[in-house]
A protein has these predicted regions:
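Short, acidic/polar
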Residues: 41-56, 113-121, 222
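CE4/NodB-like, metal-dependent polysaccharide N-deacetylase domain
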Residues: 45-66, 97, 101
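Short acidic capping loops at alpha-helix termini that bridge into adjacent secondary structure
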Residues: 23-26, 60-64, 105-106
């Protein structure tokens, strides 16, 4: 995303990709978070952010460009409503135009925020992909019914994406690190609505008390759980070091 380390993350990737043989094909994606409070139009924001990302990534096209904002009932400082996305000349129409001018091949959304407006946007078929919250703490996106689950209910979200033939990317497999390690970095902020960080910590401890080391260490279990969901086409991982990858 263009906001990660103020663009340095994209620059690092661009430097690496430009040093690799042309024959090595990678799929490149990025994300843009729009400012609904800005006097700059959404169209201008997307054009500017996309062009800057392309420059940092040293490419003339992205395979996937995603809307980074949460989708909520009411507009927030960094959140958009379904109406702002779906209205004529709204975000969806603007992002379709960047496909038409060949700067991106596919467009996607981040399926965080309030479940109903997220599903409303998904069910239009406007977007090609969705980043879906899915991990050991909340796997409800793959459920048909919420049942007794008492965290935010994302049930039927994956089913909706499948109906629209969308690519489905699992995100937050480590729950901001809570599932991966006991070490805390201070940015463990829940992105769901129903439970706080203290309750998430309690549930993490219960999970690992039951499962133990059966499936490897904590990080390995969390990744395996994400990869085990056959309805997800890929799992997005955040890695800071080569040791994390290994």
């Amino acid at each position: 995303a263009e906001t990660y380390s103020e663009g340095q993350s994209e620059k690092n990737i661009g430097d690496l990709l430009s040093a690799l043989p042309v024959k090595d094909k990678f799929y490149i994606s990025s994300k843009a978070r729009l400012d609904p409070k800005s006097s700059e139009s959404f169209g201008s924001q997307i054009d500017r952010k996309l062009d800057n990302s392309l420059k940092r990534l040293k490419t003339d096209k992205l395979d996937l460009y995603q809307l980074h904002n949460k989708i909520t009932f009411e507009e927030g400082v960094e959140t958009l409503t379904s109406a702002q996305i779906l209205e004529k000349n709204g975000v969806c129409d603007i992002m379709e135009k960047i496909k038409e001018d060949s700067r991106v091949d596919h467009i996607g959304l981040t399926a965080l925020g309030d479940t109903k407006p997220i599903r409303d946007v998904v069910n239009t078929g406007c977007f090609d992909t969705a980043q879906i919250y899915y991990n050991l703490l909340n796997p409800t996106a793959t459920f048909k019914e919420k049942g007794i689950w008492n965290d935010q209910d994302f049930s039927n979200l994956v089913s909706d994406c499948q109906t629209q033939n969308m690519g489905i990317l699992g995100i937050r497999v480590f729950a901001a690190g809570l599932l991966a390690t006991d070490i805390r970095h201070g940015r463990e902020i829940p992105v769901t609505h129903m439970i706080d960080i203290k309750e998430e910590e309690r549930r993490v401890q219960r999970i690992y008390k039951v499962v133990g080391q059966t499936y490897g260490n904590r990080a390995q279990l969390a990744v395996r759980y994400g990869l085990s969901a056959e309805s997800l086409h890929c799992t997005v991982l955040g890695l800071a070091t080569l040791e994390h990858l290994q």
